[in-house]
Amino acid sequence: MLTKITFFERFEPGILSGAKTITLRDEAESHVFAGQILPVSTFEADRWFCDIEVIDIVPVLFSALTEQHAAQENMTLPELRRVIQEIYPGLEQLFQIRFCLVQ
């Protein structure tokens, strides 16, 4: 089970503003549960910047990603597809973790 979660620094403003409300992860990073509070750090420097609460987690296929997923990720669908392919090249099975910022 995850006890913390990391994001690339470029996603920090979207998380803190509430514009980014989901993250797409592979199975290794899918072991969370609704109601879980996770400290959030930057991937690059492991710098804590907030806590999030997991709302839910659902499986989603890369080929089934929509504009709604992209909006929840605070980017366009082409951007989302590119980013996912950079992080998880060739991976079809993803897990959507929906979260909210803990104030």
Curated annotation (Swiss-Prot):
Transmembrane segments: none annotated. The keyword Glycosyltransferase does not apply. Its EC number is 3.5.1.135. GO terms for cellular component: cytosol. InterPro entries: AC4CH (IPR008314), ASCH_domain (IPR007374), PUA-like_sf (IPR015947). One of its GO terms (molecular function) is N4-acetylcytidine amidohydrolase activity. It is an enzyme of class 3 (hydrolase). It holds the Pfam family ASCH. Residues 6-92 form the ASCH domain. It comes from the Bacteria. Keywords: Hydrolase. The active site is at K20, T23, E73. It catalyses: N(4)-acetylcytidine + H2O = cytidine + acetate + H(+); N(4)-acetyl-2'-deoxycytidine + H2O = 2'-deoxycytidine + acetate + H(+); N(4)-acetylcytosine + H2O = cytosine + acetate + H(+). NCBIfam families: PRK04980.1. Catalyzes the hydrolysis of N(4)-acetylcytidine (ac4C). Belongs to the N(4)-acetylcytidine amidohydrolase family. This is N(4)-acetylcytidine amidohydrolase. It comes from Shewanella sp. (strain MR-7).
